[in-house]
Amino acid sequence: KMKFVNHHVAHALSSYYVSGYDHSNIVSLDGYGGSESGILAIGEGDELRVVKSVPNRNSWGHLYSEITRMLGFKSHSDEGKVMGLAAYGQHDEKEFTFIDWDRDIPLIDKKGFKKYLSGLTQRKKGEELNQRHKNLAATVQHTLEKATLQMSSYLYNMTGSKNLCVSGGCALN
């Protein structure tokens, strides 16, 4: 029997069912998937309960892909290069002023993000990577990690469970 499920439910279940846990907190994040870019869920036995949805306008995968593009790499393909480059830079907590951290799910102000991007100069093909590029990579990597930890903490505070499954395109980063 075949059953069709929501994009992020599929991501969540794919990590939960192979985890070996009989209960777990689950964070699924990527660029887009239907009407949302992620979910926060709880797996218990064979059941999955979605407790929060991350709307497309607040896509952490889109944020990462756009920075990938500005760094002169191919978005939706070269995000792993940005993750690797991040190790050579220093993140700047004050760089991304368009994020509201005072929520269960940190909120990306889409207009603020567009304005931020318009102030960047895209790295040209063949242009050498400089420290600014490395720092930007470190900042986007740190920001994604911080956001994922904040969402994971929200689930932990809800359930008390230390079990965590992370899935979706952002999980690699």
At which residue positions do the language-model features occur?
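Short acidic/glycine-rich loops and adjacent helix/strand connectors
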Residues: K1-N173
